[in-house]
């Protein structure tokens, strides 16, 4: 999963994940925002994980928009697709297919490659490295300096009905609500 700055081609954050699901994408996006700031907009493909209401809520809290690429239009995602091709040819191609490594080891090597190679290499479309171009625009980047604010942006929000005994269920766990007599039978928003 990767997020790329459209103008500079800087990878704001990327990592290999066991699954490409919403929670993995959310973690990568959160790290991208923590490291490189809040984007003006996020341009994604049509994948289910990018069309979720949760992503819309996260982006709304940060004050950025989400736009989805047209279906079956690979040109509209050319920059990120070109980056993935670069990962395959300049990073993954160096691996011995017989070598056993963990996901953590793979990501450690990947992060080093990103910072030491990809982010530093002069890009033919900009005549600058992605890092140099991005840093030249740094005064326009809205950083999140308070980790609590960042955590608040990325909280999941779901509705739950308070059971008669004053409990709610979230991810197969039961929680007792405050004021169970008042809230029993009512719907509440849960943030986690």
Pin down the residues of each PLM region.
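Short glycine-/small-residue-rich flexible loop motifs, especially phosphate/cofactor-binding loops
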Residues: 30, 56, 165
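Short, well-ordered alpha-helical microsegments
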Residues: 50-53
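Charged alpha-helix within mobile-element recombinases
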Residues: 56-151
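C-terminal, beta-rich DNA-binding module of retroviral/retroelements integrases
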Residues: 118-192
């Amino acid at each position: 999963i990767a997020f790329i700055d459209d103008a500079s081609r800087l990878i704001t954050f990327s990592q290999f994940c066991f699954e490409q699901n919403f929670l993995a994408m959310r973690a990568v996006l959160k790290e991208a925002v923590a490291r490189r700031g809040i984007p003006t907009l996020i341009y994604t493909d049509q994948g289910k994980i990018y069309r979720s209401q949760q992503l819309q809520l996260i982006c709304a809290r940060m004050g950025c928009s989400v736009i989805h690429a047209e279906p079956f239009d690979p040109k509209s995602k050319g920059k990120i697709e070109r980056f993935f091709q670069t990962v395959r040819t300049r990073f993954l191609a160096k691996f011995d297919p017989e070598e056993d490594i963990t996901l953590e080891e793979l990501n450690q090597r990947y992060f080093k490659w990103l910072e030491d190679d990809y982010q530093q290499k002069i890009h033919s479309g900009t005549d600058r490295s992605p890092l140099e171009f991005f840093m030249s625009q740094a005064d326009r980047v809205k950083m999140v300096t308070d980790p609590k604010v960042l955590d608040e942006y990325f909280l999941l929000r779901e509705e739950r009905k308070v059971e008669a005994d004053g409990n709610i269920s979230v991810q197969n766990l039961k929680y007792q609500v405050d004021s169970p007599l008042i809230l029993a039978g009512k719907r509440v928003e849960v943030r986690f």
